[in-house]
Amino acid sequence: MPKSNDGVIKRAIVTPDKHFPLHDKKAINVVCKAIELVKPDVYIDLGDTGEWEHFSTHFWKGRNAKPMEDLIPLLDSDVHEVNKGMDMIDNVLDKIGCSERHFVQGNHEVWLDKFVTRYPYLSHYMTYEALKLKQRGYKYHPYNRKKCLKIGKLNFTHGKYTTKYHSY
């Protein structure tokens, strides 16, 4: 289907909460097919791209934290799996020539970053570095409750006003 720009300023695909590696594989396949069909000008990842469960305070509540030598392999595995998931989407974005890409950090990435900041020697595991956002061509938008990503008249954020009560 040829792309028509009649009355369209920009086309975008926006994806929230993929939670790699716990993602729904069929849903990700649909996203990839939608990208091929829509051929968006802009792609926006609304965060929680990774699950990062081992770095959540919820995960460790009531448990003893594992020693660092056990956590590093979990961290490496999670980083690998999340990058693999992002690669699936980026490959399709590359194929259709979508170069405007935004990554809005979600609370799950905040879990990762909070863990990493406690151990300065792990700085290469911060979201921006671990997910290779610069190399992938993403503009990075840290988790920020006061400032949203704004494109035209639309605002994009992770979870700010998107609960079941968002319209009240």
Give short role names for the model-derived ranges:
Residues 77-168:
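Conserved catalytic scaffold of divalent metal-dependent phosphoesterases
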